[in-house]
């Protein structure tokens, strides 16, 4: 793979990259979806309050087209009449139509931009770069946005033209209908016009959802080197991690070896395995493993045992099973009670021999070890 190919952003963004993107304010923003929701809530509000809207419209028309000579003779009356029309009717009408839409816009803004970042309001000299501006103008995203905008404008214009030519003109220029009928008819026609536009926008918005999601993840794609560097930064350099594991393992081993001197017996396979066991019948319900190791660690355990005159028992099978079936700091499993009991009985005989003297206790050679434990031990070694 050549250098150019290795630098291509072909990898999906990691969870850390997505988190950083959210913190810096680069979120998915479904502009078309929020436009649809605002239009929907406005349309529902319009239909729900249509009686009140009609009443306010009638009052506005009545006050506007009613001639009262006394009003025009006094400027104060004229101003008062205008304010009355504006305050009592027009503001109420605008509030009914637009206030629910404004209320709905704030949750939409909060949902899409839950993290407010003031970095975007800082001055950036790169924004004045004409080359970058030219690239943004002719980017795929800009072309798609332009296409969607043109498509919406064309359709809305066609729908509005058809509704005006088919419904409004024949009613507005006819003298056979009353004013109330024309007003009611106009409100219903406006509602149907907006509903038609809303229905048409649905497939556009569904396509836009998939496009915005694809474009968002595409903009966050990473090169393989970026993914590798990010993993190193998050999890650490593999060499450093290996060194840390070695240090932790060394500390754990030193702590474990410090407990060998407290053990009652060490079971060994002469060359490879060593397991230190302790049992205190007053505060232990079973023998406990204080230390275990193989190769160099086993040699250290045996050396510490010799320095502290701890009895050492050689048993190939028992050493293997104890090493693979137990953990340091834990009690031995119940299936090994009988075998370990023989070892501890031998240890107690040695202690008695040291006090009373006599013949040195015979070292046990055969131990009861369930066959399934021995088979598991062989498989684990393999």
UniProtKB/Swiss-Prot annotation:
Keyword presence, Cytoplasm: no
Membrane topology (UniProt): Multi-pass membrane protein
Alphabetic keyword roster: Bacterial flagellum biogenesis, Bacterial flagellum protein export, Cell membrane, Membrane, Protein transport, Transmembrane, Transmembrane helix, Transport
InterPro entries: T3SS_substrate_exporter (IPR006135), T3SS_substrate_exporter_C (IPR029025)
GO cellular component: plasma membrane
Domain of life: Bacteria
Record field: transmembrane: 33-55, 90-112, 150-169, 189-211
Pfam hit, one: Bac_export_2
Keyword Protein transport: yes
Cell compartments where the protein resides: Cell membrane
An example Gene Ontology biological process: protein secretion
Entry similarity comment: Belongs to the type III secretion exporter family.
Known role: Required for formation of the rod structure in the basal body of the flagellar apparatus. Together with FliI and FliH, may constitute the export apparatus of flagellin.
Protein name: Flagellar biosynthetic protein FlhB
Organism: Buchnera aphidicola subsp. Baizongia pistaciae (strain Bp)
Lineage, highest ranks first: Bacteria, Pseudomonadati, Pseudomonadota, Gammaproteobacteria, Enterobacterales
């Amino acid at each position: 793979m050549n250098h150019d190919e290795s630098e291509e952003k072909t990898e999906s963004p990691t969870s850390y990259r997505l988190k950083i993107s959210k913190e810096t304010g680069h979120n998915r923003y479904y502009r078309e979806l929020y436009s649809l929701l605002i239009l929907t809530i406005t349309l529902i509000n319009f239909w729900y309050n249509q009686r009140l809207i009609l009443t306010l419209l009638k009052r506005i028309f009545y006050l506007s087209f009613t001639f009262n000579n006394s009003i025009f003779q006094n400027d104060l009356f004229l101003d008062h009449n205008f304010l009355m029309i504006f305050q009592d009717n027009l503001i109420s009408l605008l509030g009914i139509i637009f206030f629910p839409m404004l209320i709905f816009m704030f949750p939409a803004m909060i949902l899409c931009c839950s993290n407010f970042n003031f970095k975007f309001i800082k001055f950036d000299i790169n924004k004045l770069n004409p080359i970058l501006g030219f690239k943004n103008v002719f980017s795929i995203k800009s072309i798609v946005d332009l296409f969607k905008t043109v498509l919406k404008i064309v359709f809305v214009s066609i729908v509005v033209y058809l509704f005006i030519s088919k419904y409004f003109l024949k009613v507005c220029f006819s003298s056979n209908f009353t004013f109330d009928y024309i007003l009611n008819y106009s409100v219903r026609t406006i509602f149907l016009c907006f509903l038609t536009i809303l229905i048409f926008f649905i497939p556009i918005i569904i396509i836009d959802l998939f496009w915005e999601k694809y474009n968002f993840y595409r903009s966050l794609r990473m090169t393989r080197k970026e993914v590798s560097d990010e993993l190193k930064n998050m999890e650490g350099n593999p060499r450093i991690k290996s060194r840390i594991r070695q240090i932790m393992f060394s500390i754990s081993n030193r702590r474990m070896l410090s407990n060998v001197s407290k053990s009652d017996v060490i079971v060994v396979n002469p060359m490879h395995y060593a397991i230190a066991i302790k049992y205190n019948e007053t505060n232990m319900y079973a023998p406990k493993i204080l230390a275990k190791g193989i190769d160099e660690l086993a040699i250290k355990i045996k050396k510490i045992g010799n320095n502290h005159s701890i009895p050492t028992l050689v048993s190939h099978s028992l050493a293997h099973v104890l090493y693979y079936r137990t953990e340091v700091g834990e009690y031995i499993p119940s299936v090994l009670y009988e075998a370990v009991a023989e070892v501890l009985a031998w240890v107690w005989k040695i202690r008695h021999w040291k006090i009373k003297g006599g013949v040195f206790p015979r070292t046990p050679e055969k131990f009861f070890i369930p066959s399934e434990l021995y088979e598991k031990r062989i498989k684990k070694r393999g």
